[in-house]
């Protein structure tokens, strides 16, 4: 029985298979209870995201956990085994710490996974499938993830186009809170840009899209204003920042439109970030004195530099997870030592109580007290030295001098 981590992720399986092993929010409570019943400790946590499904169990057998996963989702066991990774004990601990720190993510160092790990732990607590070991493991993991964030630069540099666009705006404007932003398009990239802007305190966001309904649907989540592409000339003069990402085959913003907007702004600077391919903003806009135009190529060069920086930070983070996983295993081993001592004491007391009861019965039946005491001492001695004697005999026969030396030291034989 071991501490085990079983998983499937974006590196080992296709989207189709990842969808099949995923757990819905409605099913995960009962699923964890079912999984926990397969462990000796009753401890289990299921982490299920779009990129990974992982099972963490204490006092479990890895093969049995995989069999449970196959049975639960009615999947072929061999197909599942081909895409599954297994970690035990320290390797399992380190894997969880790496996952929570973003070291195993599709985007290196992404912070969202830590929240997902925390949510999985909360769900397990609610299901009653955690105890001392899993509780300590996950609490330590959260501390390690925080340590990685504070002691390395793994999360400091932008590695997505959306994040890079917002990061560029932060470098140009001392604060984004007072800026007015015009977003053109309503796809996934623009939605992610809007999220990053909101996270940075931007209060005024206008979303322009060819389909007004799509823009309105997106704006509900960000308290933004939706407009059509035809309304852009009316709103452009108010925009300090313009970020565009559409699928339009022709430019949406021309030099003339931007030039007119800048005159209305009395030549206050405007940052324009064109994420689209082909371009949404005419290249000539960059020739205007108060327009600062950046394209997706400019962002990619920033992302490449930042990815190199993250990889360097990841090397430092790997050392942290290695050290902290070893410390956790030391704690776990000490816990097991305490359990072993308790079991040994309990076993000895059971033997003592059994033999004392037998001796008292003989005395009650009129047995000779001296003979009863001698017999008690002999029986107690024989029972207590039986297991150590067997261990010494096996070590001697096998020529295992290391074990023999350890046994002699434990039994205090070298003191005489």
Curated annotation (Swiss-Prot):
Positions annotated as active site in the UniProt record: 50
Example GO BP: protoporphyrinogen IX biosynthetic process from glutamate
Residues that bind substrate: 49-52, 105, 110-112, 116
Known EC number: 1.2.1.70
Site positions for Important for activity: 95
Keywords: NADP, Oxidoreductase, Porphyrin biosynthesis
Residue sites binding NADP(+) per the record: 185-190
Catalytic activity: (S)-4-amino-5-oxopentanoate + tRNA(Glu) + NADP(+) = L-glutamyl-tRNA(Glu) + NADPH + H(+)
Disulfide bond annotation, renumbered to this chain: none
Pathway given in the UniProt record: Porphyrin-containing compound metabolism; protoporphyrin-IX biosynthesis; 5-aminolevulinate from L-glutamyl-tRNA(Glu): step 1/2
GO molecular function: glutamyl-tRNA reductase activity; NADP binding
Function: Catalyzes the NADPH-dependent reduction of glutamyl-tRNA(Glu) to glutamate 1-semialdehyde (GSA).
NCBIfam families for this protein: hemA
Complexes and interactors: Homodimer.
Family per record: Belongs to the glutamyl-tRNA reductase family.
Domain notes: Possesses an unusual extended V-shaped dimeric structure with each monomer consisting of three distinct domains arranged along a curved 'spinal' alpha-helix. The N-terminal catalytic domain specifically recognizes the glutamate moiety of the substrate. The second domain is the NADPH-binding domain, and the third C-terminal domain is responsible for dimerization.
Leftover remarks: During catalysis, the active site Cys acts as a nucleophile attacking the alpha-carbonyl group of tRNA-bound glutamate with the formation of a thioester intermediate between enzyme and glutamate, and the concomitant release of tRNA(Glu). The thioester intermediate is finally reduced by direct hydride transfer from NADPH, to form the product GSA.
The protein's name: Glutamyl-tRNA reductase
Organism in which the protein naturally occurs: Shewanella denitrificans (strain OS217 / ATCC BAA-1090 / DSM 15013)
Lineage of the organism: Bacteria, Pseudomonadati, Pseudomonadota, Gammaproteobacteria, Alteromonadales
Gene behind the chain: hemA
């Amino acid at each position: 029985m071991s501490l085990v981590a079983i998983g499937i992720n974006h590196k080992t399986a296709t989207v189709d298979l990842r969808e099949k092993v995923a757990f819905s929010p409605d099913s995960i409570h009962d699923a964890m209870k079912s999984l926990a019943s397969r462990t000796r400790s009753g401890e289990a946590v299921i982490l299920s995201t779009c990129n990974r499904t992982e099972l963490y169990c204490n006092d479990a057998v890895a093969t049995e956990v995989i069999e449970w996963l196959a049975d639960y989702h009615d999947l072929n066991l061999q197909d599942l085994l081909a895409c599954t990774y297994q970690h035990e004990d320290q390797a399992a601990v380190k894997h969880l710490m790496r996952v929570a720190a973003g070291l195993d993510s599709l985007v290196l160092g992404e912070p969202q996974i830590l929240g997902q790990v925390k949510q999985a732990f909360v769900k397990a607590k609610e299901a009653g499938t955690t105890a001392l070991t899993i509780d300590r493991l996950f609490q330590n993991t959260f501390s390690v993830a925080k340590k990685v964030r504070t002691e390395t630069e793994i999360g400091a540099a932008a590695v997505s186009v959306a994040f890079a666009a917002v990061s560029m705006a932060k470098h140009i404007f001392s604060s984004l809170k007072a800026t007015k932003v015009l977003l053109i398009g309503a796809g996934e990239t623009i939605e992610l840009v809007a999220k990053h802007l909101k996270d940075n305190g931007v209060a005024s966001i206008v979303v322009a899209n060819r389909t007004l309904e799509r823009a309105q649907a997106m704006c509900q989540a960000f308290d933004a204003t939706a407009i059509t592409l035809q309304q852009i000339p009316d709103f452009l003069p108010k925009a300090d920042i313009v970020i565009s990402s559409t699928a339009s085959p022709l430019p949406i913003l021309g030099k003339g439109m931007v030039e007119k907007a800048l005159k209305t702004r009395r030549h206050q600077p405007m940052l324009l970030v064109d994420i689209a391919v082909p371009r949404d903003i005419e290249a000539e806009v960059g020739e205007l004195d108060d327009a600062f135009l950046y394209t997706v190529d400019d962002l990619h060069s920033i992302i490449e530099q930042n990815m190199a920086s993250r990889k360097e930070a990841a090397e430092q983070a790997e050392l942290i997870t290695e050290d902290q996983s070893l410390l956790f295993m030391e704690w776990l081993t000490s816990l097991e030592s305490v359990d072993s001592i308790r079991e040994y004491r309990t076993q000895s007391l059971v033997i003592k109580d059994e033999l004392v009861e037998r001796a008292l019965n003989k005395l009650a039946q009129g047995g000779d007290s001296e003979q009863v005491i001698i017999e008690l001492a002999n029986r107690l001695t024989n029972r207590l030295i039986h297991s150590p004697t067997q261990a010494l005999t096996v070590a001697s026969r096998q020529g295992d001098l290391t074990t023999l030396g350890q046994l002699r030291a434990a039994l205090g034989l070298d003191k005489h």
